[in-house]
């Protein structure tokens, strides 16, 4: 390359890197730096969810645990380039008000406010993994420009402390967004696996597109979960799985096959499904699975809930 060509490339890089940084931080923002949520929730979410009172659902009364699974779509902060897609602080407080009523919470797309949201709900324990490698959001210069792009957006909160916590980035993802193959912009993907004293819990969020690249990526992601479960979790251990699987088995035969193979390979029973969101379990008694109709109220997804009975304590 000539000296003139090299100078042109250097000049372009001087403009391209700052421009890319501005676009990325403007599009997806950064983690919320405000330490606490101070707004008040005045949105009547409890009516949309089917609860007659704002303080519902009632706290758990016996040994059962009440579990909430929800893609909360908290992806950008107000003031970013795509702020029309951003939650207000009041909406996040409403999400926290609902989550605070549950013993165990599995959130997806908790990208920008995981820490203040976890503090707000008052759960004893919370975990929000961030990957340093893998998952799709770790390439340079993205990792330098966008701190939340290394996050899979998974937030788990519980009233009891776990005995072991693990997270693993996915090796497969659909890549750049197109009309049919979506990797949720630049964010990473992976799963969160937690061992509590009497049972295990897995939380995840899979690729979102409808195209073949996304279908293939989801297949490999589910296979990676299966490999992780067989490697890390005893086959007779009680296990709860809650996730935004981004499967639509009712309209896509390949998705149906992926789901069936995943359930069969891991000895799981599908407890509840609404759209792309699922609850599955093995060696656990579950009761009253339901959908909370919060899509269009506090998120672009409905929430799922279920009661699980505490298994006997291991000897």
Question: For each of these PLM feature ranges, what is it?
Answer:
Residues 1-8:
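N-terminal secretory signal peptides that target proteins for export/translocation
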Residues 25-26:
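C-terminal motif of bacterial Sec signal peptides marking the signal peptidase cleavage site
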Residues 69-90, 176-184, 207-217:
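Acidic/histidine-rich helix-loop elements
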């Amino acid at each position: 390359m000539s000296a003139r060509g090299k100078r042109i490339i250097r000049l372009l890089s001087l403009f391209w890197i700052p421009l890319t940084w501005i676009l990325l931080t403007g599009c997806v923002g950064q983690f919320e730096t405000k330490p606490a949520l101070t707004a008040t929730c005045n949105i009547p979410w409890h009516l949309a969810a089917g609860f007659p009172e704002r303080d519902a659902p009632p706290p758990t009364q016996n040994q059962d645990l009440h579990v909430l699974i929800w893609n909360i779509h908290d992806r950008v902060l107000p003031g970013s380039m795509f702020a029309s897609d951003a939650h207000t602080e009041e909406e996040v407080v409403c999400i926290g008000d609902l989550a605070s009523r549950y013993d165990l919470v599995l959130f997806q797309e908790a990208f920008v406010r995981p820490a203040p949201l976890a503090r707000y709900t008052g759960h004893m324990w919370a975990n929000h993994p961030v990957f340093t490698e893998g998952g799709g959001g770790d390439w340079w210069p993205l990792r330098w420009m966008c701190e939340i792009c290394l996050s899979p957006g998974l937030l788990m909160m519980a009233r009891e402390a776990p005995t072991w916590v693990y997270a693993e980035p996915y090796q497969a993802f659909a890549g750049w967004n197109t009309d049919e193959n979506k990797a949720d912009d630049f964010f990473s993907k992976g799963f969160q696996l937690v061992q509590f004293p009497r049972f295990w819990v897995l939380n995840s969020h899979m690729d979102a597109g409808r195209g073949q690249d996304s279908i293939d990526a989801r297949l490999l992601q589910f296979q990676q979960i299966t490999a992780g479960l067989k490697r890390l979790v005893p086959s007779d251990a009680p296990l709860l799985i809650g996730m935004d699987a981004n499967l639509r088995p009712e309209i896509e035969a390949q998705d149906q096959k992926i789901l069936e193979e995943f359930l069969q390979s891991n000895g799981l029973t599908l407890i509840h499904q609404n759209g792309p969101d699922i609850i599955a379990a093995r060696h656990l008694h579950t009761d009253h699975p339901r959908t909370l109709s919060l899509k269009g109220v506090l998120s672009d997804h409905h929430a799922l809930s279920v009661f699980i009975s505490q298994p006997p304590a291991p000897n």
